[in-house]
C-alpha cells in the first residue's frame, strides 16, 4: 500500500508541473500577442498619405516597423501559409517549424543549454532561421516560399511608407503623457 501511495503521489506531481508549464506558456503567448497593435489603428485611412521626401520615407519605415512589428510578422506568416496550401508537405513542415519556434524561442523562460553550455538568444535565432530556410527549401516549394516572402515584404514596406507616424507612440511614457492630457495642443 505504501508503494501505491508513493506512486500515486509522484504521478500527481507531474500534472502539476505540466499545468504550471502550460499556464506559463499561455501567459507568454498572451504577452507576445499584447505587442500586436490594433488592426484598426494599422489600417486607419485617415492616417495614410504619401511621404514628403526620402528622409520621411526612411523615418516612416523605421517607426512603422518598430510599432507594427507583430502585425507585420502576422501578415508575412499568413502570406507564406496561404502560398503553401498547394504544397501540403511544405505546409506540414512549416507548421512543425512554427511549433519549434514557439517552444525554442518565444516560450522559453530560461536560457537554452546544450551539453552544459548556455546558448545565446541570437544563436538560437540564427540557428532556427537557418533550419527553417533549409527545411522549407528542401520541400520543393522554393519558388512559392521566396515569392511569398517577397510579396509579404512588399506589402509591409508599402504600408510602412504610406502610414503616417504622427499618432504613433513607441514608448509607454509618451503614450501616457499624451493620453493623460499633460501635453498642450495649440487651439485652432
Swiss-Prot record:
Keyword annotations = Endosome, Membrane, Transmembrane, Transmembrane helix, Transport
Q: Which GO terms describe its cellular component?
A: endoplasmic reticulum; endosome membrane
The name of this protein is PRA1 family protein F4
Residues in the signal sequence:
none
Superkingdom of the source species: Eukaryota
| Family (UniProt) | Belongs to the PRA1 family.
- Tell me if S-adenosyl-L-methionine is a UniProt keyword of this record: no
Q: Where is this region: Disordered?
A: 1-25
Organism lineage reads as:
Eukaryota, Viridiplantae, Streptophyta, Embryophyta, Tracheophyta
- Give the UniProt subcellular location, in the record's own words: Endosome membrane
Residue ranges spanning the membrane: these are: 67-86, 90-107, 119-139, 142-162
Organism (species): Arabidopsis thaliana (Mouse-ear cress)
Alphabetically, which GO biological process terms does the record hold? vesicle-mediated transport
Q: Which Pfam families match?
A: PRA1
Q: How does this protein sit in the membrane? A: Multi-pass membrane protein
Q: Where is the composition biased (Polar residues)?
A: 1-13
Gene name, per UniProt, is PRA1F4
State the protein's purpose: May be involved in both secretory and endocytic intracellular trafficking in the endosomal/prevacuolar compartments.
